[in-house]
Amino acid sequence: MARRPRTIGPSASDPGFSPQHALELVRSAIPPVHPAGRPFVGAGLALALAGRRHRWLRRAGLLAAGACAGFFRHPPRVPPTRPGAIVAPADGEICVIDVATPPAELSMGDVALPRVSIFLSLLDAHVQRAPVSGEVIDVQHRPGRFGSADLAAASTENERTSLRIRTPGGAEVVAVQVAGLLARRIICDAHVGDKLSIGDTYGLIRFGSRLDTYLPAGAQPLVTVGQRAIAGETVLAELP
């Protein structure tokens, strides 16, 4: 006589099962939403509620809420612990590795520095994270165009916000949020004097964009063009 398979894991009849436990499992499986995205998710849910008697309107509202929740997702990340690591400030595909002069508004001179650029598609998480631990010594916003973020000219012509961080050892790393064709809003929550830890969330770009990281002189990129980067985890380079 065949035996009934034993159930693995908690079930509603298990003494250890509770609604709170189920809620924790759901929370661990679904990334939270960045605060900037909550109004968009709320608007979609409000539309679904208002059109609850109309199938297509209800579906449109739920789809919009789900799409916004996905776009503004804020997944947890675990930065590397080895000293000297410079991590990717954004999710996306590495589209450029070259040498370029940092944005003029930062007044860092005309010395070209190693640069790694990441293109963020609509499907990527759009929160930005600190590439290194240190103090924010400059934040500059420069208005500009809203051209396609995957073009080379985007770094110099598009609207951007530049964040300059100085590590405890004196090295400086610059992360530049670059607007794109659909990205019409750059959010930077970091201010001069703030202390950031590697992997801390400091900003967000809506919707589709680019992130340029200027490394200290002498730093060698450890990534390649076309590689996928994970914000706060992928090591772009090491401090020289």
Curated annotation (Swiss-Prot):
It is found in: Cell membrane. It is an enzyme of class 4 (lyase). The modification Pyruvic acid (Ser) is found at S209. Pathway: Phospholipid metabolism; phosphatidylethanolamine biosynthesis; phosphatidylethanolamine from CDP-diacylglycerol: step 2/2. Is synthesized initially as an inactive proenzyme. Formation of the active enzyme involves a self-maturation process in which the active site pyruvoyl group is generated from an internal serine residue via an autocatalytic post-translational modification. Two non-identical subunits are generated from the proenzyme in this reaction, and the pyruvate is formed at the N-terminus of the alpha chain, which is derived from the carboxyl end of the proenzyme. The record marks G208, S209 as: Cleavage (non-hydrolytic). It is a peripheral membrane protein. Transmembrane segments: none annotated. Signal peptide: none annotated. One of its GO terms (biological process) is phosphatidylethanolamine biosynthetic process. Its cofactor is pyruvate. It catalyses: a 1,2-diacyl-sn-glycero-3-phospho-L-serine + H(+) = a 1,2-diacyl-sn-glycero-3-phosphoethanolamine + CO2. Belongs to the phosphatidylserine decarboxylase family. PSD-A subfamily. Catalyzes the formation of phosphatidylethanolamine (PtdEtn) from phosphatidylserine (PtdSer). HAMAP family: PS_decarb_PSD_A (MF_00664). Heterodimer of a large membrane-associated beta subunit and a small pyruvoyl-containing alpha subunit. NCBIfam families: PRK05305.1-3. This is Phosphatidylserine decarboxylase proenzyme. The gene is psd.
